[in-house]
Regions:
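Conserved short alpha-helical segments that host acidic/polar catalytic motifs at enzyme active sites
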Residues: 1-245, 249-250, 258-292, 304, ...
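Glycine-rich oxoanion-binding loops at beta->alpha junctions
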Residues: 49, 66-83, 274-286, 309-345, ...
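Extended hydrophobic-aromatic, low-complexity segments
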Residues: 181, 305-307, 322-323, 352-355, ...
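Generic C-terminus detector
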Residues: 226, 252, 541, 567-608
Length: 608
């Protein structure tokens, strides 16, 4: 969602703030702004649209103060206009905010009754005036923030600077991430470590309810009660040099092509390739034999990774699996069994709905395991055990390499649990590990052979609607393929289990409808072929993603075939993810869309 940066140091802060905000562009945004303190006085510059618009504004109207805050906004309350852009200010302070203040209308009405004037449509402006009201009552900045925070309902991260206080930067967190960076004679606030990587790798994270008072040389952490607390200082693994497209046109293209490397790196972290066994890089805090059920919750693409994993856990570990989207599960008050394990999947480790599910599971006596790409994230810290993906920072809003790395980790977990529970013997484990070892090479073969995909994309770009079909682990890929196409090309697409075709979707089939069938050579290929023939019989345009064997079995005229190498079906889902990503990518590029920052989308959804 929104990105927050704060800097207190000795040199001009605005340029550094903009540099840090560029590293948060991947979160998605529609406006940006900076506020600094120069000679003790607040000044703001804001702009609608991309950061380059803010840079142009700053070039004409520079800010030179050594203390400042910056923000990239993703609209939740109020349209994406300059007037609604952060920082918001009163006569005493400026504030930036990530999250949602749920009771802002109630607070706004109260503050209006006390003479406060509001000039924006946002919930954030209420925070500025609420703290200002406390200061008008005689409190200093820190005490005013302390008094205001308990009155705010919702999830938020905040950063404040105060008129007349040139050595003071205050941050607060409730439900949305916020990190403190430690420098030499300067201190930093940021939504994540990636934003602060050019300046420091020495990081501490606020916990829920925390607020922190920063000066150039010190960080004073306080909990919700105002008591002094310590938070561990960690060495961030984020690099100042990671945000780079290399020789690719878009981050998404780069990240698709990085998959052979990062999937290989992730698998190497979990597999003993010489012995043909899974070696988890952590101790499981439970007895696998005592598990009674697995519950998986996640959002978006991570949910589809969990849906693939359901097949693996049931097949290899012989465990029943329930999976639900986190935004639904968290409100269901679902009964959870004794001996249950909750697995949550999140690229950022900060997804609000997924975090709520994790906390619900812990409150109800479940063991918890998190598959995350950010090992220092809130979800990683709060779970019983974190299973890291080694995808590296993913900048494109549409997830690609994080998805295949999530699948890789979940596959290893399924094998490990199956072996520990006696559902797999050593020979079968070695066979499955051998299949996983082959995955990076198969991915490399797919991502370097894009001619057929690029040609098909030019045709697909003219479609109004697209249908994706699959069975088994290819069914979640059909859902993911439809999501990818919707996300970045804005073409309406739907994914279905191929066996459900006759239960409704077949009514949509005509000569205008492209039907993309994901069909590895697996035990249900014959059934999938019958579905393709049903589509062809009704004039539908069948596009097959599979190997040559499936083409031969289909025995129909295909509009297009995206060729895949022959492989074992067990983990074909990891490899078959690449062509659906590439097809969405090239279609969107052909249409001239903003692939890395599609409209209305955010990378890390830290609000409900």
């Amino acid at each position: 969602m929104c990105g927050i940066v704060g800097i207190i140091g000795s040199g001009p802060a605005a340029a550094k703030i903009v540099e840090a905000l560029k590293r948060l562009e991947y979160r998605g945004y529609d406006s940006a702004g900076v506020a600094t303190l120069e000679d003790g006085k607040l000044a703001r510059r804001r702009a609608q649209g991309k950061l380059r618009n803010l840079e142009e504004r700053l070039a004409k109207e520079p800010l030179n103060g050594p203390l400042g805050i910056g923000h990239t906004r993703w609209a939740t309350h109020g349209k994406p206009t300059e007037n609604n852009a952060h920082p918001h200010a009163s006569d005493k302070l400026a504030v930036v905010h990530n999250g949602i203040i749920e009771n802002f209308r109630e607070l706004r009405d109260e503050l209006r009754g006390k003479g406060h004037n509001f000039v924006s449509e946002t919930d954030t402006e209420v925070v500025a005036h609420l703290v200002t009201e406390e200061m008008r009552g005689g409190k200093g900045p820190a005490d005013a923030v302390k008094a205001a925070l308990p009155r705010l309902r919702g999830a938020f991260a905040l950063a404040f600077v105060f008129d007349g206080h040139p050595n003071l930067l205050i941050g607060a967190r409730q439900g949305a991430p916020l990190a403190v960076g430690f420098g030499e004679g300067e201190m930093f606030l940021g939504s994540d470590a990636l934003a602060l990587a050019p300046f420091t790798s020495d990081i501490a994270y606020l916990e829920d309810g925390d607020w922190v008072v920063l000066t150039r040389d010190d960080a004073d952490f306080r909990n919700a009660a105002g008591a002094k607390v310590s938070r561990p200082r960690l060495k961030s693994q984020a690099s100042a040099f990671l945000v780079d497209k290399g020789n690719h046109r878009h981050f998404m293209a780069k990240e698709i092509h990085e998959q052979p490397e990062v999937v290989g790196r992730t698998l190497a972290h979990y597999l003993d390739m010489s012995s043909g066994a899974v070696r988890l890089p952590f101790e499981l805090p439970f007895d696998p034999k005592a598990l009674t059920r697995i519950t998986i919750t996640a959002c978006g693409t991570a949910y589809y990774a969990g849906l693939v994993a359901k097949y693996w856990f049931e097949k290899f570990a012989r465990l029943p699996v329930e999976i639900d989207v986190a935004s639904e599960f968290r409100y269901r008050e679902a009964p959870l069994p004794e001996g249950g394990l909750m697995i949550v999947v999140s690229q950022s480790g900060e997804t609000a709905d997924t975090l709520a599910c994790l906390r619900y599971a812990k409150e109800n006596g479940q063991r918890t395991l998190a598959v995350v790409n950010v090992p220092t994230s809130t979800i990683a810290r709060e779970s019983d055990v974190a299973a890291p993906t080694l995808a590296g920072p993913e900048i494109g809003v549409a997830s690609t390499k994080a998805f295949t790395c999530q699948l890789s980790v979940l596959a290893c977990l399924a094998i490990a649990l199956g072996r520990a529970r006696g559902a797999l013997d050593a020979a079968r484990e070695a066979e499955l590990v051998s299949e996983l070892i082959a995955v990076p090479g198969l991915l490399a073969e797919v991502v370097k052979s894009t001619a057929a995909t690029e040609k098909l994309a030019a045709t697909l770009a003219k479609a109004r609607d697209v249908l994706y079909l699959g069975r088994g682990t290819a069914y979640p890929l059909a859902l993911e393929g439809a999501l990818k196409l919707k996300e970045i090309s804005y073409i309406h697409a739907e994914g279905y289990a191929a066996g459900e075709l006759k239960h409704g979707p077949i009514a949509l089939i005509d000569e205008e409808m492209p039907v993309i069938v994901i069909a590895p050579s697996d035990p249900v290929l014959e059934k999938t072929v019958s579905n393709m023939q049903e589509v062809a019989a009704r004039g539908g345009r069948v596009i097959l993603i599979s190997d040559d064997h499936a083409v031969h079995e289909a025995a129909i005229n295909l509009e297009a075939h995206l060729p895949m190498p022959a492989m074992s079906p067990d983990f074909a889902a990891i490899v078959y993810a690449a062509p659906i990503q590439l097809l969405a990518y090239y279609t969107a590029v052909h249409m001239g869309k903003d692939v890395d920052q599609p409209r209305n989308l955010a990378k890390s959804v830290t609000v409900e």
